[in-house]
Every structure is written in structure tokens, then in C-alpha cells.
């Protein structure tokens, strides 16, 4: 593309709206309850496109009505597609109103698809001397690519894009030029659009045939030369191939037009855009849009300024002294300093050996470089024996106030995850009141959010736009290093995040629970868990044999020796088309086949042996691939696996585990237990597991104050049997195991806000019976009904539910018009006070136990947290003392109307400890 020509972006509105709708969780709503997740995702992609390409003009094309143009050629065109989701359909008029406020032309014509409008605009723009960018997720648009027409292809989610040029199209299709893309689809077809193509010819074969013969016409002319089944299909479906090519060809004669000279972007009123965004409740993007017009007509966001940098290499005594002096100054002044370690290769760093510690203070940015070039200069007050980065961080952690977007990772600079590496500082030596994790703070303020990227943080808490970092699209020659920008932004965020937490009652949770937990998690991650690779290998081989046996049984029952059991599409075909299993009530996927998800198969398993075997095959295959084959390679130099604990993932406040995820090993299946036999304690030690008993039910008793519930726990009764007696009207002595099991399901279902449908599914009973059981439960425990009703009413009024400690969970679904979403919001509001409080309690217990382990000189280590359970690696001679201490801490975290009970067990392996 030429730099001298004007650039226009033409956006495929339907494609981006669909992609955004499925990429952004359905938890966003306008103040009036209308869903806005697709709009939010669309606008996010829109802004990223503007930032990356800075087009001179933007237009958006939409489908209008049925695709008459192609349906006239192929009546079944797109006929298999399910109706558009009502929540997505409702957002199209809203996005069009917003685009009108942005003064972005909307192009559509009755009976024409957006694809053809993009094609028409591509050719019109090219003729007008413009460079054209077609923003779409449809690969068939690659046929339009020329020297002056590129496709910005949206792929996974909203952030992964590819710029398709003639060269990249040729590379993708192995020698097929853009003009031959319709020929490719003529052979391959397109299942998403119901374009038939030639049966049995997939993308690789289609590319190979066209590359060999030069075009579809030549492939057809030489059809007799194509051997085997593929040749038979080709010769039998020549008409289908020609029709498919015609249908797949993008039209360039749609009845739309645009005055390219008179169209420009941005050219909107700040007031109109602010009002439109405010109406939809999407205020977080307001400043990003207003920044595009530099404040004309409204108060636009300023650009975040990156301070000048003082750079110091390890051997540069003068510069190093200046940085050290600034570190000493901020420590003495009690100021916050942001610290970010950059492992990326800086420009000029030989083979990427230079590591840089970026520090942001009130005076500016400072970069400490550390390489292999020699010892650091001596500076008073600092110990650089292990490098300048370690020396500066050690002093900051011990004496200063440190901010970071990933405090735990920063602690691992001095306390490496691999325990075979030298530890320079015990994380527990850090005063948690002097550390500030900006991402944890942002998470507490919006725990339902999945990402806390820097653009979002700057926009939300500083009302500023971030300059592009070095290496990003559109970055200038003087763009800051990514880590430099991160450090500067982190320091700037401390004050506004602290202010917002104070206003929203989140400071106590941040200061009293989350920050004290950070050093504890760092220490646990370093401790790791000992795993036996030989045991893993043996288990994997044994399971592989079992999987092969199950596969043979499945294929025998199916009468098909070739189908891929792991393919949902092929499995669906075998079960429902070939074997004729019932499909009543089943939904089809977007690709047109019946779902084979776990829920569907579980319902069918009761009556069909093959389905039971498939579920068994899936469980065994998952255990083998996820754990038995993966854990061994994850061992570090100390022979241990070291999971990462995440504080900002779950909306409830619970910790999650990753790389590897040790919390998700199945606890109730024999296979899950088998995996745990590979984890052992060190020589002379055992596993100690201490688990809260029924903590969420005990919290329900405390929070509801129901006298019968409180009495049952205080008197130490079998709570589930007591519930069964009250609900089913029989003496406790006559409660059968089945009645107790049903009562247990109701007890835990109530905690999670379960309604009649959910209970009927879990107990395999009718809706009427489930509804009657729930009604009788509330009659038995009337205080619970009153409490839950009040929780939901309060959440609808405030927009959030909260824990005993003030941890809030915002629940926008409570305002949704969709009854299913609204029901989810109500169940979430009911559950959060119990589940969220349980998460708070276990976190407080972890911090207290960790301190006492240090203070009382235990050799034992806390090595794992799984929901309501803490696990320890404990020398045999400490088991009794440690058990007493841990139970004492866990049972006295908080005073409730009912006792908290912690139960302990031990074993040589993790499996034995339960």
C-alpha cells in the first residue's frame, strides 16, 4: 500500500458483532438492562483498528434482510444456521445509533450481504485512488486482496488479527492467488454457509488441485486424471463445484456508493458521542474516543506522559550511584516506587543478555541494566553481590514501599520458584502494608472482569490514553519500552486505585486479606510439590492400555472402526445419524450437528452402554493428557512441580491454580485419586491435609440466623440427616441413605441459589417434586428464605452482593431483560455471601498459619490450597503439633453463631491424605 494515497477502512459489521458477542461475556448491560457485550467488543476492536492503522475514513457495512442475491442461486444458502441470539439481535440497532453519533457512514441494501458491500467498496475505493482495508473475519474476502486492498482478518477473539496481502494469501493457500479463492471454495465448499463444494475435498486437497492445474476450470477439464474416490466425487459433482464457486464469489456491484473525498474520520461531536456512550453505560471508552479529536467539542482525554529515563548499566558507577541515590531518597521520604523487571531483549543488547529493572518514582523513570559485562560498582547502602537488580529490589522490599502489576512475580526475583536456586530473601520478611499490586486492586473493584490490560487501567482510573509502546503497531521512533510504560503507569495508578477502594469499601479486603496473602503465595509456589516421574510414566502406560480397550469396545458397538471418538462432529454423526439415539430436546451446534457435550451424554448414558463408554474414554483421556503426560515435564531442578496461584481470576474471590492446575484434579473419582498417588512428601515427611467441614452451610446458618439451622450445627447433629427429617417429615432415626442424599443435595443447592430445575436435574426427579422439596426446605428453615430474599433485593438495589468482609461482586445480570440471565444474577447474589466469605476466611487462615509456621520454628511447609483445604509437607515428628496449630488457626479465624470445624488427615502420598 502507498503512503501517499488516502486509506479507508470498511468494517464488516455483522462479522465483528458476531465475533464480539461470543468473545465478551454476557455480563454487560446498559442502565436500562439492555445487553451491550457485543457493542463493547465491537468498539474495542474499532478503537484498536483506528490506533493501528489511523485510516482517513471509516465505513461499516451490514447485511439487510435475507441474502436474496445468493439464495436465488442456491436456495439452501445459510439455511442450516440457527436464528440469531435475541441478545445479539437487540444490539444491532444500538450499534448503528452509536455509529451515527460517531459520524461513521453505514452502508446496507435490501437483499445484499455485507460481504458484497465490502467488495463493492473495495473496487470503488481502488478506482478513486484509495488504499482500502477490509476488516472482517470471513476468509472468502481474501479474493478481494490486491496491491491496494488488504484484508484485516480478525481471528481468535478480538485481539488476534492478520493483515492479508497478495503475498500472504498466496502463502496461506500454498500458491493460490486471491483471484483463485472462489475456485478454492468451489472445490472445498463452505459448511458455515451451506455451500456444497465437492464431497471429500478438504482445504489441502483443494489447494493442491488448483495449484497443480491452475484454476477450477482446468481441474474440471482434467477431472479424468484425478484418481480414486476424489476423482469419482469430482466428476460426479462438477455442477456443484461451478455453482459453489459462483456463490462464493464476492459481488462488486452492490447498489451502494460513497463520496470518498467528503468522508473522513474522526469527524464527530464529542458531546453526541459522550451522550450515546453514557446511554449505553459504556463510559470506560469515552476518553479513548474523545482523544481521537483532541478535545474539540468536549473534554478529551490527555495522553499519558512517559517521563525521561536515566539509564544505568551495572558497571557505570556514576549512573548507578544516581539511581541508588534516588532509591534512597524515596525510601527516606516514604514514597511509592513502581518496579518492573524486563526480560525482553532491549535494542542493542547482545543476544538478549541484558535484563532491566525499571523504576518509576516521583522524579522520573530509571533503568538498571544487568548483563554479563562485569561486577557492579559498590554503592553505600546496597548489596550488589548478586547483581544490581537483586540489590535494589532487596532494599526496596525491606525498607521501601513497592508497587507492581505482578507483585508475586517481583518477589520471585529474590525467591525463585525453583527451590534448587538460591533464595536471597524470604517473602514473609516483606511487610504487606508496604506493597501494592495494582492489578489485584483493580480486580477487587471489578472482579467479573477477565482482563486488566494497561489501556483499560489508564482509561478507567486516569482518564488518559496510553501512548503506543515500542514494537506495537503505530509506535513512533521515540516510543517507550513496554516495561518502562508499565512502570510509569503503575506508579500513577496507586493513588486513584487507593481512592476508589476507599470509596467502594474495598480497602479492608485489599489491606487485610489480599496483600498479606501475596508473600504467602510466593513462598508456597517456591515450596512446590514432589512428584515421581516414574510413577507418572507407569500410570500413563497403564491408562493408555485401558483407553485402547475402551476405544475398541466403542467401535464394536458403533460398527465403525475408523471414526474419531474425539471429534464432536463425527461422534454426533455416529450416535444420532447412524445408531439413531434419541435427539428430542437436543440442540444443534452452529456447524449443524447435535451437541455431544457432557450434559447431553450424561443424560443418554443411563440407557446406552456406548455413551457410558464414551464418557469413560473422555475421563481417562483427559486424565492422561492433562496430568499423567504433563506433570513430569513441568518438574523443575528440585524435582518438584510449582503451580502458580492466581488472585485475579475468579469472580468469587477464590484462588485458582495454573501451570499446572492442581485444584482441578478430580477428587471424587478413582482416576483422580490415582493421579494423586504420584505426589509424595519428602523423605521423613508426610502429607497433612486440613479441610473446613461444610463451611458454606455453616456460613449460611450464621448469616441467616435461622434458629433451627444454628441449633443443628451447635449441637453437632448430622446436619443432612436433620434436614431430611425436617423436609420429609420422618424421625431422624428413620432417615434412609437415599433421603439423606436428597437432603444433602438440597442443602448445597440452596447455598448455590439452585432452583427447582437445577435440583430436578441433579436428583433426576420431576420439576414438581423438586419444587415441593425446596418449598418444604424453606418451611423447615424460614430464616434462610428471608435471608436469601433480602440478599437478592439488596443486590438489585445496589448492583452488588458482598461478603462478611466487604468483598463486593457486581452483578449486572440482575438488570438483564433476559430471564435466564436475570435468574443467573439472582443465584449469584444468593451464593456470594457464603462462597465469597469462605474464600476470605481461607485466605486469612493461610496468612495466619504461614506466620505461625515461621514464628514457632516449624520445618513443615504449606504447599497447596484447594478451595477449603490446606495441604502441608510435614516431618513425621511435627504432625501432632502442626495439626493442633493449623486447626486452631482455621477454626478461630472468625467468631460465628456456629463453630467452624477443620478436619485433618495424613498420608505418605497426597492420595493417602484424604
Regions found by a protein language model. Give the residues of each.
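Function-dense linear segments that define catalytic or interfacial modules
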Residues: 360, 445-468, 482-490, 647-732
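Acidic, Mg2+-coordinating catalytic module of metal-dependent nucleases/exonucleases
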Residues: 184-219, 462-539, 743-748, 753-758, ...
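Conserved RNase H-like, two-metal-ion catalytic cores of nucleic-acid enzymes
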Residues: 6-9, 19-59, 75-76, 80-87, ...
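Short alpha-helix plus adjacent loop in nuclease-associated cores
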Residues: 76-90, 141, 146-175, 231-233, ...
Amino acid at each position: 500500500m502507498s503512503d501517499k494515497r488516502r486509506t479507508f477502512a470498511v468494517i464488516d459489521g455483522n462479522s465483528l458483532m458476531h465475533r464480539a458477542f461470543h468473545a465478551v461475556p454476557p455480563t454487560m448491560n446498559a442502565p436500562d438492562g439492555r445487553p451491550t457485550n457485543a457493542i463493547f467488543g465491537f468498539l474495542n476492536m474499532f478503537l484498536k483498528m483506528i490506533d493501528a492503522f489511523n485510516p482517513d475514513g471509516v465505513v461499516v457495512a451490514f447485511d439487510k434482510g435475507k441474502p436474496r442475491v445468493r439464495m436465488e442461486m442456491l436456495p439452501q444458502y445459510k439455511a442450516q444456521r440457527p436464528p440469531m441470539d435475541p441478545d445479539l439481535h437487540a444490539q444491532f440497532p444500538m450499534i448503528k445509533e452509536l455509529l451515527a453519533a460517531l459520524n461513521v457512514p453505514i452502508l446496507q441494501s435490501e437483499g445484499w450481504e455485507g460481504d458484497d458491500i465490502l467488495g463493492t467498496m473495495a473496487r470503488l475505493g481502488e478506482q478513486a485512488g484509495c488504499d482500502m482495508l477490509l476488516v472482517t473475519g470471513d476468509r472468502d474476502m481474501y479474493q478481494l486482496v490486491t496491491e491496494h486492498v488488504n484484508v484485516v482478518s480478525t481471528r481468535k477473539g478480538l485481539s488476534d488479527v492478520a493483515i492479508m496481502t497478495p503475498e500472504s494469501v498466496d502463502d496461506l493457500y500454498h500458491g493460490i492467488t486471491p483471484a483463485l479463492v472462489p475456485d478454492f471454495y468451489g472445490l472445498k465448499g463452505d459448511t458455515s454457509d451451506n455451500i456444497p463444494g465437492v464431497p471429500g475435498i478438504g482445504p489441502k486437497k483443494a489447494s493442491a488441485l488448483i495449484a497443480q492445474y491452475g484454476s477450477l476450470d482446468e481441474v474440471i477439464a482434467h477431472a479424468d486424471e484425478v484418481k480414486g474416490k476424489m476423482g469419482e466425487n469430482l466428476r460426479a459433482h462438477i455442477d456443484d463445484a461451478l455453482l459453489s464457486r459462483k456463490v462464493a464469489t464476492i459481488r462488486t456491484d452492490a447498489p451502494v456508493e460513497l463520496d470518498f473525498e467528503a468522508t473522513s474520520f474522526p469527524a464527530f461531536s464529542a458531546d453526541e458521542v459522550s451522550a450515546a456512550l453514557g446511554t449505553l453505560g459504556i463510559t470506560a471508552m469515552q476518553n479513548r474516543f474523545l482523544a481521537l479529536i483532541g478535545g474539540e467539542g468536549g473534554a478529551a482525554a490527555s495522553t499519558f506522559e512517559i517521563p525521561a529515563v536515566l539509564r544505568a548499566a551495572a558497571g557505570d558507577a556514576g549512573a548507578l550511584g544516581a539511581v541508588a541515590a534516588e532509591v534512597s531518597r524515596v525510601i527516606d521520604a516514604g514514597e511509592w516506587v513502581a518496579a518492573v523487571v524486563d526480560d525482553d531483549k532491549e535494542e542493542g543488547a547482545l543476544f538478549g543478555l541484558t535484563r532491566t529493572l525499571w523504576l518509576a518514582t516521583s522524579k522520573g523513570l530509571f533503568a538498571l541494566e544487568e548483563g554479563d559485562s562485569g561486577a557492579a560498582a559498590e554503592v553505600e547502602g546496597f548489596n550488589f553481590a548478586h547483581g544490581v537488580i537483586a540489590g535494589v529490589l532487596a532494599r526496596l522490599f525491606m525498607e521501601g514501599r513497592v508497587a507492581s502489576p505482578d507483585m508475586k512475580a517481583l518477589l520471585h526475583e529474590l525467591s525463585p520458584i525453583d527451590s534448587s536456586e538460591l533464595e536471597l530473601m524470604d517473602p514473609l520478611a516483606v511487610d504487606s502494608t508496604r506493597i501494592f499490586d495494582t492489578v489485584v486492586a483493580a480486580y477487587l473493584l471489578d472482579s467479573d472482569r477477565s482482563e486488566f490490560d494497561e489501556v483499560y487501567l489508564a482509561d478507567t482510573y486516569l482518564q488518559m490514553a496510553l501512548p503506543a509502546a515500542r514494537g506495537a503497531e503505530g509506535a513512533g521512533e521515540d516510543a517507550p519500552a513496554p516495561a518502562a510504560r508499565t512502570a510509569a503507569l503503575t506508579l500513577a495508578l496507586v493513588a486513584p486505585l487507593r481512592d476508589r477502594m476507599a470509596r467502594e469499601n474495598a480497602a479492608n479486603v485489599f489491606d487485610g486479606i489480599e496483600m498479606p496473602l501475596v508473600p504467602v503465595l510466593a513462598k508456597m509456589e517456591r515450596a512446590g510439590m514432589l512428584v515421581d516421574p516414574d510413577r507418572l510414566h507407569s500410570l500413563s502406560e497403564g491408562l493408555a492400555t485401558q483407553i485402547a480397550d475402551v476405544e475398541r469396545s466403542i467401535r464394536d458397538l458403533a460398527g465403525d472402526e475408523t471414526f474419531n471418538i474425539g471429534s464432536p462432529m463425527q461422534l454426533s454423526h455416529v450416535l444420532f445419524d447412524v445408531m439413531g439415539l434419541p435427539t428430542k430436546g437436543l440442540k444443534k451446534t452452529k456447524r449443524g450437528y447435535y451437541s455431544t457435550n457432557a450434559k447431553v451424554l450424561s443424560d443418554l448414558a443411563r440407557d446406552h452402554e456406548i455413551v457410558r463408554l464414551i464418557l469413560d474414554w473422555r475421563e481417562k483421556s483427559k486424565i492422561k493428557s492433562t496430568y499423567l503426560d504433563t506433570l513430569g515435564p513441568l518438574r523443575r531442578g528440585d524435582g518438584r512441580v510449582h503451580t502458580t496461584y492466581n488472585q485475579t481470576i475468579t469472580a468469587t474471590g477464590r484462588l485458582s491454580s495454573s501451570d499446572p492446575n492442581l485444584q482441578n484434579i478430580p477428587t471424587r473419582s478413582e482416576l483422580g485419586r490415582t493421579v494423586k498417588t504420584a505426589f509424595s512428601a519428602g523423605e521423613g515427611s508426610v502429607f497433612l491435609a486440613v479441610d473446613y467441614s461444610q463451611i458454606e452451610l455453616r456460613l449460611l446458618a450464621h448469616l441467616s440466623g435461622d434458629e433451627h439451622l444454628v441449633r443443628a450445627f451447635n449441637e453437632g447433629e448430622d446436619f443432612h440427616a436433620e434436614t431430611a427429617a425436617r423436609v420429609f417429615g420422618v424421625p431422624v432415626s428413620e432417615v434412609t441413605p437415599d433421603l439423606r442424599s436428597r437432603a444433602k443435595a438440597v442443602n448445597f443447592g440452596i447455598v448455590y441459589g439452585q432452583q427447582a430445575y437445577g435440583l430436578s436435574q441433579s436428583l433426576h426427579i420431576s420439576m414438581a417434586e423438586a419444587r415441593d422439596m425446596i418449598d418444604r426446605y424453606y418451611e423447615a428453615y424460614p430464616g434462610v428464605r428471608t435471608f436469601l430474599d433480602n440478599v437478592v433485593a439488596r443486590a438489585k438495589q445496589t448492583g452488588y452482593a458482598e461478603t462478611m468482609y466487604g468483598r463486593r461482586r457486581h452483578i449486572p445480570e440482575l438488570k438483564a431483560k433476559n430471564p435466564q440471565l436475570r435468574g443467573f444474577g439472582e443465584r449469584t447474589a444468593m451464593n456470594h455471601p457464603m462462597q465469597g466469605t469462605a474464600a476470605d476466611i481461607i485466605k486469612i487462615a493461610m496468612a495466619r498459619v504461614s506466620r505461625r509456621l515461621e514464628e514457632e520454628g516449624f520445618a513443615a511447609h504449606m504447599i497447596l490450597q484447594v478451595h477449603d483445604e490446606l495441604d502441608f509437607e510435614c516431618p513425621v515428628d511435627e504432625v501432632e503439633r502442626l495439626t493442633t496449630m493449623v486447626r486452631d488457626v482455621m477454626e478461630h479465624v472468625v467468631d460465628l453463631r456456629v463453630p467452624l470445624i477443620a478436619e485433618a488427615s495424613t498420608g505418605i502420598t497426597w492420595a493417602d491424605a484424604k
